[in-house]
Amino acid sequence: MEKIDNRTELTPKQIVEKLDGYIIGQDKAKRAVAVALRNRFRRLKLPEGIRDEVAPKNILMIGPTGCGKTEIARRLAKLCGAPFLKVEATKYTEVGYVGRDVESMIRDLMAVGCNDVKAEMEEQLREKSVSVVEDRLLDLLLPGSGKKGKDGKSEKTEGGAKPLGFLSQVNPNEITIDLHKMAEDIQPQDEAENPGQPENQKADDSAAEADNHTREKFRQMLREGKLEDREIDMVVHRNIGMPNMEIIAGGSLDDLQNSMQGILNMMNGSGRGKKRTVTVREARKILTEEVLDSMVDHDKVADEARRRVEQSGIIFIDEIDKIAVRGESHGQDVSREGVQRDILPIVEGSNVNTKFGVVDTTHILFIAAGAFSVAAPSDLIPELQGRFPLRVELDSLHKDDFKRILSEPKNSLIMQYTALLETEGVKLDITDEAIDRMSVVAEEVNASAENIGARRLHTIMEKVLADINFEADEHKGETIVIDAAYVDSKLEGISQNQDLSRYIL
């Protein structure tokens, strides 16, 4: 899904149209999400006084598994352009228990925001970094030909050409340089300009001029792509970051562990990097990352990311029904209720310490989703229910929905399997009757066994195409027609037998 450059102009109707290209049905959920997303943009246009008073209306999506809750979140993340994080409520534990505390979701969202902002800044600096990377590649290809230090000697570069000498590997047809002749040509000119210059200085200047000429020849070859497969030695630095007490004090246990690991790496010298032999093509990628990382202002990245997270961040909490408690609390239920109470201040608005600074969660939009097949939304603690004022029920899927899911969305299941087999030279022709039959089987199995929604189609498609996928090399250049009879032959007896369908489909 393409990102919209001017997202503030994306109306709720346009957002729904974008989602329609990937998700079948569930119009109520799409409309609720579209309005919530649009309200984020509307709020940013308000005067500062009233802007702080407008709180996001958090959404609770209720629907059976496989009906599109997670897919809506996944597509929304690619569409909104704002810091977006999808988490599962079940991976968090109450404060005091072993596991991740709920505040880590804010730290993770902040990390997502920083990565997005850094990627944008690097893209803006990419053109400027090309010349820097080119010079560093030339320093590695021609050690000693780079910038001169105060003593007149070339600055030391890490790595360099292979031990046999890089010049010996160059094709004579590509470049021919007579260093002695160049030195002779340069020397008389230098003598005319500086008649009193010492002999050693003249020789050094002549050698420097020859080096520069050689460097420019190699620069031209580098730009023409003639050196991409040459091997060079270089020192690759791991981006382990600089540990500091701010990270330890303001982060989580994971941050503390990473900081301590960074300190240990610095003490044992592993932070200095590792020498590797790579091609020029690989070296360019490595150097580009290093140069861009050094050019980016990381303080500005953190500030801009924090602003985006606080003003337009979105967190999608999946499986929230799994932390709901039915009846009286006991055993593990106590911990589940504790997680709910820990989530409360985050959703309502509080300050969370992260390694990038303190983040205010007041205006972060939370979208929660759950099947609620065992528990009900009313089993959540009342305080948490009140933090999700908008409730949207998603519909169960039936055969007509399955038929549309198989064929209508962009990059649908049928399109995916057809494209995969085309790489083997096999053309797949799936008839409408076959699609109808697979849709009926999916509905029947969902009704007789566990209802897993559209995920049942993946299982059925794999079962129908199992033999073709295995024997694809034997059918190269052929067109295989999948009709209703073929589908029945592969699923014969399975859909009617509940025991078989429970374990196979």
Q: Model regions: which residues?
A:
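Non-catalytic accessory segments flanking P-loop/AAA+ NTPase cores
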Residues: 1-505
